[in-house]
Amino acid sequence: MMLSNISQTKAELLSGLGSSLTSSPGNVSAATMKLEAVMENLQRQHQQRMMEQHKNDDVISNDVRCDDFSDGGERQRSYSGSPKEDSDEDRNDMTSPMMRDDDDVMQSDGRSPEPDKTSLITQQMAFAAALAQRSSPDGSLSSLVPQAMMQHFGQFPASFDASQLPQGFRELAMLQHQHVAQRMAMEAQKRMQQDHNIQQSTNHIPTPSSASSHTSSGSVTSQTNSCNGSQQEWTYEEQFKQLYEIDDDIKRKEFLDDLFSFMQKRGTPVNRIPIMAKQVLDLYQLYRLVVEKGGLVEVINKKIWREITKGLNLPSSITSAAFTLRTQYMKYLYPFECEREKLSVPSELQAAIEGNRREGRRPSYSSHMFSYSPNTSANMLTPPKFPFAHHNGLAQLSQMAAAKYGQPDERCLPTSPTQQLIAQQQQLLQSANAQHVAAMAALETIQNQAKARQAAQQAAHHAAQQAAQHQMSLKKEIDSDYSEGEPPEKKLSFDDSVRRLTPDNQRRSSTSSLKISMGDRGRHNEMSDVTNADSINICVEVNGITYQGVLFAHSPNHPPVKHVTLDHPTS
């Protein structure tokens, strides 16, 4: 029912507009002037309403705009209504004599159109024309008005002319359209700015490789220097990206993922990639070359670092390339080699480094900077716990250590003051550690020598004690056999013989035969008169040889015996 009324109203509007255009020019001009006055009032009210809407920052949609036009049509109905039906309402709402004249003129036309529906549809047509003008490429209203009206308000004649719209309605629609267009343009610009900011932030966010899952600590900036001193800065993510994209080897990514995961689980995550010759050191290629040669210990013992350098395509002009490669390998790859390949153990590596040092090679600070544990591979290389004492001679110690042990040719020299201070402290620790190791080695040698001397002294003392005990036991046996009636001279001569058997006298007489001076009776025929009380049978063991003989006593009346020859020794 409502759709049929709207269609009928559209037809009446078109017929009314056509008849008004075909009528006399005077009536058309008078109606146009009065309609323009009404539209001026509507425009002022609309401007006030738009100011209120602008304060509230409400987004106006197409439906809201249609409702605004409907509200304007209702206000216009209050002006164009009959004085008999809405006389009280007209007196309260009309603000100028021109509004009352509008009612008289529209009543004098002799027609009785439906003013509410007519004004509503007229405003809708004006708004449709404004929409058509916005959509038109050349800004004209002639080509796209029928299509816009068909889209928004239903079927309209194809021959409809937009110039038939009153001037006031058209300006009102255009004013509202301009305001909405400005709001839409501002919102579109704001959205574009937001999209641009989001895109910039997305571009600045680094795209980490698969190894970034092992390092969630954020972006760590690593500033490095080349071997010639020229500075070159790469971020942590750029270094990882270069390391993963050196070549297209399929095993590279798998190896690097395993390496970083192992170091992370071990508690020593890789937070900096070493740089050599202005490029990232290829840890994968370095590991592969060293393992092919038999491991790090074999490379150190065979001194084939030059082949490793050629395999990495490093320039031969790099000084101390072997020292740098060995240091970096021990820091980043050797624990992984012990865990996966098991080509050597840390004790063998330490022995190889010490043997290389004895041959005159420069000492490696990293060989003593770590303590090794044979129980588990996870704690294979742990930082040392050396106390570092700060004193006034720190700079002098640093210079002496640098002059004696040399500076390691690092390709990743620090640039900031803090990093330089840390590097100096590390160098001082390295030199102090080397001196400490040398002092400990010398002390160990001295201790070993002292232990050897002490062991020899203990052995000699033990032998002397055994000899003394044996002599004492022999003396006790002799004393027990001849304790009764033994003359004092015999005891004295026996004490003298025992005194000769002391360790000092044994050493003196070890190379000569034993001769014992005794007294002699003078004549040989008188020997038969000697009784058993005048002689003693004696048995002496010297240096493992047993000597047996007879000792004769002498009296003051007889001359002393020149010498006594003992029996042949028995072993």
Swiss-Prot record:
Coiled-coil spans in chain: none
Domain of life the protein comes from: Eukaryota
Gene3D superfamilies registered for this protein in UniProt: ARID DNA-binding domain
One Pfam family this sequence matches: ARID
Region (Disordered): 45-117, 190-229, 459-528
Comp. bias intervals (Low complexity): 207-224, 459-471
GO molecular function terms noted in the UniProt entry: DNA binding
PROSITE patterns xref list: ARID (PS51011), REKLES (PS51486)
Entry's localization field: Nucleus
Compositionally biased spans, kind Basic and acidic residues: 49-77, 487-507, 518-527
Underlying gene: Ci-DRIL1/2
Ranges of residues in domain ARID: 249-341
Protein name: Protein dead ringer homolog
Domain named REKLES: residues: 473-558
GO cellular component annotations of the record: nucleus
Keywords: DNA-binding, Nucleus, Transcription, Transcription regulation
Biased composition (Polar residues): 195-206
